[in-house]
Structures are given as structure tokens and as C-alpha cells.
């Protein structure tokens, strides 16, 4: 399912509570709005491609006028990103797909970002063996991330493999 239709009654459960598990992208729209009919399918396609990394929630402002008022919707389409129960970013208008993709990168953590958070937790707990495979996978996914290389070098130093640490750090541009 590429999106969920949200009502005034379901907003708390479908958006606010869900946003503690995954980012929720809320599309405020109306059936009569031409730009909304252009933007909607783009957001739905991106949500489908995201495979659960974030949730697309659609609010018909004609049916949920109080939500539109509560969130100060001045014009539609209006898209807001909710994380941990709060709006973290938004845009208005029917942006082209590449601009929406760039916007999503700002508000939805990548799998590499999530891996780094998990690895930092392992490192903080002294669980270097648990952090290593997480960081190695993150490095394969995004070899340009310098922070991943630094953490891998830290693990090598911890393991007494100074030459390995130096080799990892030497590859940083």
C-alpha cells in the first residue's frame, strides 16, 4: 500500500504515534486541486519505492478542515515531515520529483545513517565486535562516508591493528 488516508480522528494514531517508528510524510491535498493531482502520484511512487523507510499519509483538507487549520495550511498541496511527533520540515507546491527526492534525503535517515547510530551505540558500550559488521556493511553501501571509515579505524586501533587503522585512514580523501 503506497499510502494511508488520514482523518481528523485517525491523525494521532496514523501520524503522530507512527512518526516515533518511521518518518511520516503528510500530504495535505484536496480533490479539486490540480497541482495536488500532479504531486500525489509522485509521492505515492516514492513511498512505494521506499519500501517502508517512511510512511505517506494523505489528508484531504476538504474532509479534515480542522487539521488544515491546526497545521496552518495556507495553500495546497502542502507536505510536512513528522519525526518523533513533530513537524521537522515541509514544502508547499507541486515540486518536481528530483527536488522531492532531495528533500526526502534531508528528513528520512538513510540506512547508512541508521547503521552509524547503531554502531555508535555498540562502540559506546564497548561492543566493538558488534559494531564492526554494521560499519563494514555501511561502508559497502556508501564508501564515501568518512565517518564510517573513522569508526572502522577506531575498531582496528582497539584490536591493536595499527597498520590496518592507518590503511583505512590513508584512504580518506
Predicted regions and their residues:
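Proteins that catalyze or organize thiol-disulfide redox chemistry
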Residues: 1-51, 65-66, 72, 76-78, ...
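Conserved SAM/SAH-binding loop
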Residues: 61-62
